């Protein structure tokens, strides 16, 4: 059998192809913050007030709240508009009139909190440090010494502060709303 000689140009091509395949993720391929930020803006169900806000954190916060956190399911009452409940096989339509305004009952004495900005612009009426404390510890800001029930704060407590900051910044950007019926 004859020798197979591979031209250097082919070897170079193969080597570069392997290096390209092993490269770290980059913008636009779904593995970076930029694509999550853009997706967050794409899926935000309400108009956002970006004035004076960190745009990147707002977009990332929207992504976490709307694509990962499922916050709407408990903090919007009802979560979906009539005819828009995906759990009933209907095309999803978020209840934007009461979006994240709380009011969902989970038994006696347990009602989801309004996360929208209060009159001073603070989400749920909390400063960032208070919000961070709630998500890390589960301490109920309205009832000191008590832990939040139903809210999955033990899971959110594992998040890095930057992601919690992004959630907070997104909540600052959504419109204020009142709880549903």
Would you name each region that the model predicts?
Residues 2-10:
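Bacterial N-terminal signal peptides that target proteins for export
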Residues 10-19:
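Bacterial N-terminal signal peptides
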Residues 20-30:
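Bacterial Sec-dependent signal peptides at the C-terminal "C-region" and cleavage site
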Residues 36-66:
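Electrostatic cytochrome c docking/interface patches
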Residues 54-79, 84-99:
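Sequence/structural segment immediately N-terminal to covalent heme-attachment motifs in c-type
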Residues 63-76, 130-136, 165-169:
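C-type cytochrome heme c attachment motif
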Residues 90-134, 154-164:
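Electron-transfer interface patches adjacent to heme c in soluble/periplasmic c-type cytochromes
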Residues 143-155:
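A cross-kingdom feature marking solvent-exposed beta-strand/loop segments within repeated
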